[in-house]
Amino acid sequence: MYNHKVVEKKWQKYWLENKTFKTGTDPEKPKYYVLDMFPYPSGKGLHVGHPEGYTATDIMARMKRAQGYNVLHPMGWDAFGLPAEQYALQTGNDPATFTDENIAHFKKQLQALGFSYDWDREIKTTDPNYYKWTQWIFEQMYKMGLAYEAEVPVNWSPDLGTVVANEEVIDGKTERGGYPVYRRKMRQWMLKITAYADRLLDDLDDLDWPEPIKEMQRNWIGRSVGAQVTFKIKDSDKSFAVFTTRPDTLFGCSYTVLAPENELVKEITSPEQKEAVDAYIKSIESKSDLERTDLNKDKTGVFTGAYAINPVNGEEVPVWISDYVLATYGTGAVIAVPAHDERDYAFATKFDLPIKEVVEGGDISKEAFAGDGVHVNSDFLNGLHNEEAKAKMVDWLTEKGVGEKKVNYKMRDWNFSRQRYWGEPIPVIHWEDGETTLVPEDELPLRLPKESNIKPSGTPESPLANLTDWVNVVDENGRKGKRETNTMPQWAGSSWYFLRYIDPHNDKALADPELLKKWMPVDLYIGGAEHATLHLLYARFWHKVLYDLGVVPTKEPFQKLYNQGLILKNHEKMSKSRGNVVNPDDVVDEYGADSLRTYEMFMGPLNASIDWDDNGPSGVKKFLDRVWRTFVNDLDLDPIPSEKITDKNDGKLDKIYNETVKTVTEHFEELRFNTAISQMMVFMNACQKVDKIPREYAEGFVKLMAPVAPHMMEEIWHVFGHDESVQFAAWPTYDASKLVESTVEMAVTVNGKKRGNFQIAKDASREEAQAAATALPHVKEFLEGKEIKKVIVVPNKIVNIVAK
């Protein structure tokens, strides 16, 4: 009887002790770098959702090794971040100790699932030897002018005591923990990701990534081409610029809108409107950008009492403020053409502002018309369609010096400051004379000091500000300075970790340039779709910076990306609060790691979200037990190969075996693991129907199944008399000539009635088919005493006999 508890521990110990999965370095072999999104080691440990992606990459790693590749398949820990700090605050524990305990637990769970990681390359972002290089990258960005300080409106979370990035705010609350977020201005470190906007956008075209992820990044970057136009304030020397993608509709502008935070608002508001304007500005303080720009929300706004002059026709148009205009997007001001823009139309209708048609084609008494049409009421644009009119208007604006063509981006620079303790220290010193300098490279890493009081200060300073011994510094000339007390966000360490796996113990460089050339880019990267505009965008940005520095040899880090779906329970996402989390440890204990791995790959397509079935692993275990019984006789103490295994081949399994090798190999390559496993089940069914199984086919099947259920397959391989791990056995190949049947079944009719079937070599001659048909005992009966008048043979199908 197969005992998974004994066998799985035995092989896990063997793999670890023998370093079976050490990264290959044979210069003659091609490389394959297969990567999981490394996990945040939370206190909860793994749930059954984690192993789905990990099993998929593990199958690929194991197959590629067997196919003769040097495989890099590493694992590490994204260990900085708010959850550990929140836990530490609530319990009084040290986040470092808590994190290391969690890592040990996670690692034990991963090893119990038999993943073929090269543990010699394990990294964690909280290791000073690792974040030395995170700090080094920051310093290079600073020198390139890509890291700068600015007073910016930020998403401040008082509960967390820190700022969170735009990407981390959902419906006015923090992505993690759901705490309320308020807008306020603070001094922040920013990374100039906008300098790379065009490259981040254009290079998406060359990547083998899911289209929805590419589309999310395109929308996030949000490149739009239009014009920037200057509007003067009536009776004033003040003016403001607006960006518009529809300069052709300027003749239809009936009002303008400024962001409430726009500096100009205070200067131009009339005394009569001041109270209303101030009250409105206060009312929107806690709204996030996403809430403010939601198309479905009710429009709000206030008139400033000021008027602007439309440069194309000299008309006076009222200046309003509204929260849907963001100070950080474009110029923080927009023109409103309600006849041809849905949002402007809703606003104008609500506040009874004029609606002027300048493009024919709709009914503006009912709704805005945003389509193409002939321009009217537009002076020199009359009679033109949209694109021609845009070009002509841009030329006119440029000629008159009141505007120009402009490309705009929705993406903002990346807010890189966090007012927390548990993050990488930013290696910067602010001196009393106003100078800011970097910590010298030879002094990196700037270590995070050990500290028990890590309570957020509730101010723009992090808890590090309380550590005066650490913060205060004096240079050799007696000049006093203070260290930067903000720390980096959790996204910093994960923006380059895939490079460190290539050379994890290098203390002279982030990684050896020759090794980077050998291994980059990552060939396959599997992880969740929820990181589309965070980690995946940030990592691409950092990689491009490192490419410009000559540190990395490729423009992009991840050639192929694949998103695994969610594993649901009762059609809901698993979470502790819902009480529907399935712990993999329990499944492994009862059914074995091989059963869990095989079930998760067999559930359905890898990229689909699928409901967990509690009976699933037991069903898969029955299949695996059948594999064991088919190949192994374990009636005595020492298991031996089953009596069915033979060195002879009678050809009965030729077609199904070669089909199985072909299908499994192709479907693994395409990440269609569920259909590959189905094919292996079909082969096992065929094995039940024959008396003998050729050893070559039994061993070939074990090699195919080993990436999915590695423990049992190692054991069977060992029973078959092999000393080395099945991982070192060459991947099976198929014989194309055996994919077609060598024999066919033909039917026989006598005088129009079916009288039997017979097997014969495919494409046998008419004479051979007739001889075989007339030799059948049942046919002989019906021909007795009769004369055969005619025989019609349809090759490979039927023999028709006419007899009298």
Curated annotation (Swiss-Prot):
Species the sequence originates in: Lactobacillus delbrueckii subsp. bulgaricus (strain ATCC BAA-365 / Lb-18)
Cited Pfam families: Anticodon_1 (PF08264), tRNA-synt_1 (PF00133), tRNA-synt_1_2 (PF13603), tRNA-synt_1g (PF09334)
Entry's EC annotation: 6.1.1.4
Family as reported in the entry's similarity comment: Belongs to the class-I aminoacyl-tRNA synthetase family.
SUPFAM superfamilies: Anticodon-binding domain of a subclass of class I aminoacyl-tRNA synthetases (SSF47323), Nucleotidylyl transferase (SSF52374), ValRS/IleRS/LeuRS editing domain (SSF50677)
GO cellular component: a single term: cytosol
GO biological process terms held by the UniProt record: leucyl-tRNA aminoacylation
Primary site of residence: cytoplasm
Protein's cellular compartments: Cytoplasm
Catalyses which reaction(s): tRNA(Leu) + L-leucine + ATP = L-leucyl-tRNA(Leu) + AMP + diphosphate
Binding site for ATP: 576
Alphabetized NCBIfam families for the sequence: leuS_bact (TIGR00396)
Segments carrying motif 'HIGH' region: 39-50
Protein name listed in UniProt: Leucine--tRNA ligase
Gene3D superfamilies hit by this protein: 3.10.20.590, HUPs, Isoleucyl-tRNA Synthetase, Domain 1
Keywords, sorted A to Z: Aminoacyl-tRNA synthetase, ATP-binding, Cytoplasm, Ligase, Nucleotide-binding, Protein biosynthesis
